[in-house]
Amino acid sequence: MALKEEIERIVHSAWPDPFEILGIHVIKWGGKEYVAVRAFLPDAADAAVVEVGSGREYPMKRLHKDGFFEAVIRGRTDVFQYRLKKTDQGNKTSLIIDPYSFLPILSDYDLYLIAEGTHYNQYDKLGAHEMTVDGVEGVFFAVWAPNAIRVSVTGDFNEWDGRRHMMRVRGSTGVWELFIPGLRQGVIYKYEVKSRYKGFLAEKADPYAFYSELRPKSASVVWNLDRYLWSDNRWMEARKETNWFESPMSIYEVHLGSWRRVPEEGGRWLTYRELADSLVPYVKDMGYTHVELMPVSEHPLDESWGYQTALYEYGDPLKGEQKDWGTLVFNYGRTEVANFLISNALFWLDKYHIDGLRVDAVASMLYLDYSRKPGEWTPNKFGGNENLEAVALIKRFNEIVHGRHPGVLTVAEESTAWPAVSRPTHLGGLGFSMKWNMGWMNDILRYFSDDPIFRKYHQNNLTFALLYAFTENFILVLSHDEVVYGKRSLLDKMPGDFWQKFANLRLLFSYMFAQPGKKLHFMGAEIGQWWEWNANSSLDWHLLQYEPHKKLQAFVKDLNDLYRSEPSMHEVDFTYEGFEWIDFSDYGRSIVSFIRKAKNPADFLVFVFNFTPVRRYNYRIGVPKGGFYREVLNSDSGLYWGSNTGNQGGRNADAIPWHRRPCSLNLDLPPLGALVFKPA
């Protein structure tokens, strides 16, 4: 018979493995063996055990007023299948399948891999999964909670009572599991976790949940992602063979909650179905090649943009807190946490067929003293400031992603001079495919924010990035970070009057697309947002009724089209062979010119930029050969709300040596304008 201490610990939910007490057991009593079935049914007035097949009933005795029942079956020593017959306070009877009648589900091999930190498909094992066990349909729950003394599954199905569905811990792994019969997709649940720390009790969302409630609610939802049937095999195979380093990449960065809203319905967000029908056609029409979605996992604070998550952080505040952002830091050095993070990355690739992943704030991971004062951080074992655990995690993440999913990109937002971020790990790099060029972004925005009269003193801000442009596989970015927190929108950063602001912005975009490196625009830049980005409201699409904004949008579309169609603008982004200065030394007039070349050097474009509002007539630049040079883009065209200063569609090269080249073009340069020429 059950001991009083055991009963009390079940009733007060203080037993780490309830299967040791609850369910069916062969017991010894008085020197003889019997079968005992025990159940904790807080809402039952009476209970009985019903044998499957024979239908034979065995009454259960209440051993505790809170609902602990036991049936000791004399004359039987066999473990048999049964159901629990429960009679509630209203005398209503129901037949239930005992969740404590099932054997463990996670295999020893699964547990070994989880403990080792190499179970990279954890999302198929941990979390909530519909399954059939011994012919019984239900949901299997599993979670890693190493510092818990008890974990329970709670939900509407048990009135959020953490005593009813206590989970079993699997040895010393810290993994808790339970199969609950009768549950199915759509069930709302949480884990109730009792901590070793003073018995602290907390409700937690499932870190492996496939679906979550909308804030302010925070429960997880059982969902079966495998019900969706993919039809993209052709793309998935083609992706493996795609050389993204030589392909056009013009990325449109999107925050789905504020790209567009429905004002007629209280400013609600668009659904994913609505986004598929509106965002995808828009991006394709604008000529962008990729979309970068800011974090899409459900999050309780809209203003966090989806970055602020919790769980599995360092216990040491010298490692586990990022004070600048008020966020906690994952415990990179623990194998199970590193496994969780890598498995999470693979989840998006496996279940959602995502084509790339960007890792945010990599610098804060790499450096132990990142934004910390002396005394606020602990050196590594060599006395340095490098976070060796984070470095190891990043390298392993990249190796596994690239190994399992050829053709998938990994991108680092890394703001320091850490070397070889986008170089393979076997060459000593971190293994990312590409890296955001934060230095270029800072320099270029500082330059464009200057009044043109002072730009001649700061031309190095335009040209300095070319000194290190080929040390990494860079993406040139104008991201969300530059249009928030008082930094102003891109258009509002531009100096000058109304016309000059638009001219400067077109010039900025032109210079960006002409430089080596892939490209990224944050949403709203293409229509000339006046206000900073606000995650709680839509972009100002109404601006497109005004000519300057509509024509700016048309310019970005044409710029994207040119970028995609001209190999010289994207084939050789990461080596010096694709770029050649014509002249960067005309500081006095703030003019620069250069050549971009394709893999075939004979395929090239000539770029000329005038960064002042002064028209320059008869301005000569050297070119590699004679013939006619067609003007394929003019940012000052009347089509884009410019002054329409140009070169009548192109110019013939003169046999006049200039800039150490055999021929030259005599050009009229528009104010705050960019010109692009292609030889016939």
Q: Each predicted region: which residue ranges?
A:
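Carbohydrate-interacting/catalytic domains
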Residues: M1-P248, Y272-V283, G287, F498-F502, ...
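Hydrophobic residues within beta-strands of alpha/beta enzymes
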Residues: A47, V151, V291-L293, L357, ...
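Feature marks short, surface-exposed loop/turn motifs that line or immediately flank catalytic pockets
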Residues: Y197, S258-R260, S297-P300, A363-M365, ...
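Substrate-binding/active-site clefts of carbohydrate-active enzymes
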Residues: A209-L214, R227-Y228, N233-I251, H255-E386, ...
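Conserved alpha/beta catalytic core and glycan-binding cleft of carbohydrate-active enzymes
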Residues: R215-P216, H353-D355, Y370-N536, R564-I621, ...
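Conserved structured core elements
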Residues: W269, T335, N339-I342, G356, ...
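Alpha-helical packing segments of well-folded alpha/beta enzyme cores
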Residues: S278-L279, V337-W348, L393, F397, ...
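Glycine- and acidic
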Residues: Y312, F330, N380, L490-M494, ...
